[in-house]
Amino acid sequence: MKILQVASEVAPLAKTGGLADVVAALPKELRRMGHDVRVAIPFYKEVSSGNLPVRKARKSAEVALGGELHKGYLRQTALGEVPVYLVENRDLFGRDHLYGPPEGDYPDNPLRFAFFCRSVLQFLKRMDFRPDVIHCHDWQSALIPIILKYELGHDPFFNRTAVIFTIHNLAYQGVFPADALAQTGLDPSLFSVDRIEFYGRINLLKGAILAADAITTVSETYCHEILSPGQGCGLEGVLERRQADLAGILNGLDSEEWNPSLDRRIFRNYSSKSLAGKGADKRELQRELGLKAGASIPIIGMVGRIVEQKGIDLVIDLLPRFAAEELQLVILGTGDLRLMHQLHEFRNKGVKNVSINLGFKEPLAPKIYAGCDMFLMPSRFEPCGLSQLIALSYGTVPIVRRTGGLADTVIDVTANPREGNGFSFTEFSADACWDAVQRALAAYRDREGWRKIMRRGMLRDVSWRSAAGKYEELYRTCADNRRG
């Protein structure tokens, strides 16, 4: 099949979160399965300053939006054997950030991503590349299913193209004031309750949910959770309307990038058969971060965005308890300025067993996964989560809140001693989180039992093979339905 993946980021070209990893790994696996898979993202400033060679494809697009004509150019590079198309417009994408500075999003984001989506559709025609499936990711690509259904529904070039739309995080919906409609180029008739209108505003994610041939989320549990008012973010009714076309497909992990037996970024390689190298990684992490050396001191790691979704506010409340325990805590991340300020204030107290590293330092992340004994993810909600998959692969036992993809991948040792690969808690509270930490610390004292827990996690297949097979099946079903 011919498949185009459309997203706002792909690793390592442009990345702010897990979306970029998915859009890098899924096409690679589909390519191995014999499909003609390509990727389209904007040509951001950070892409142009990267190391991959980028060539101009001598194709241009013109899009009228907001009363102005915007011109774009097509550039091309590749990630392995996967071609990557880059939509260039320096005014719109030649900026320092993908979506906006720390203070907030760029106000013209609806125009920026409308231009991107419309340019992609123009370039497909100019290249004469007719995808069987266009797979769109998150609100930044939401205009593609909307345009194909309501504007180009009778266009012979696209009438056999199925559109899959994946929700990576329902909290980000592409909601804008009603007067931003002109920036999208959509007909005003689409500003209605059964199209893109949402409480007097534009909601691009809603429009994509209603327009796509099929909708997926990134784990089975999250797929069920978003049908409830608690996690539906106001769209539970819309999702319920499309429930027959909604599926949860658990993300995989790129086992070429994240493999402790091959990873060149860590101090010493190791595997489930030979764990000795993990001890060396622990010693090196302690040395690098100025922590007290000691093989018997448990280290708990956290890597990710410093935002309330990730439960970092629980961890901040628990910092005095962590500081008083015979353990070490390592935090790496960047995000919400208020939460980062609270972490900075605690760091200034000079607590010796807590290492807080603000700002995302890419080389440190794999060292934390390899060098820690446990990995903490107390998320409020977690559509899928990649960090716990990495932790499992690296023998770093996850401690998680039982939600979304965390519930689908981490089996609690307390509830299931024979198959457990981590520790979990249900209630979103500091005490419930601390109870799970204490259960993990108690299990850690049984060294042989702990190694069994580590190995169970490392032996779990978290690769993209299974997920790619499910996507392939969905693609075929939707493409066949399109052909009639």
UniProtKB/Swiss-Prot annotation:
Superkingdom of this protein's organism: Bacteria
Binding-site list for ADP-alpha-D-glucose: K15
A cellular component annotation (GO) from this entry: cytosol
InterPro entries per UniProt: Glyco_trans_1, GS/SS, Starch_synth_cat_dom
Pathway involvement of the protein, from the record: Glycan biosynthesis; glycogen biosynthesis
SUPFAM superfamilies: UDP-Glycosyltransferase/glycogen phosphorylase (SSF53756)
Gene3D superfamilies in the record: Glycogen Phosphorylase B
Top EC class of this enzyme: transferase
Catalytic activity, EC: 2.4.1.21
GO molecular function: alpha-1,4-glucan glucosyltransferase (ADP-glucose donor) activity; alpha-1,4-glucan glucosyltransferase (UDP-glucose donor) activity
Swiss-Prot/TrEMBL keywords: Glycogen biosynthesis, Glycosyltransferase, Transferase
A biological process term (GO) from this entry: glycogen biosynthetic process
Role, per record: Synthesizes alpha-1,4-glucan chains using ADP-glucose.
Family: Belongs to the glycosyltransferase 1 family. Bacterial/plant glycogen synthase subfamily.
Name of the molecule in the record: Glycogen synthase 2
Gene source species: Geobacter metallireducens (strain ATCC 53774 / DSM 7210 / GS-15)
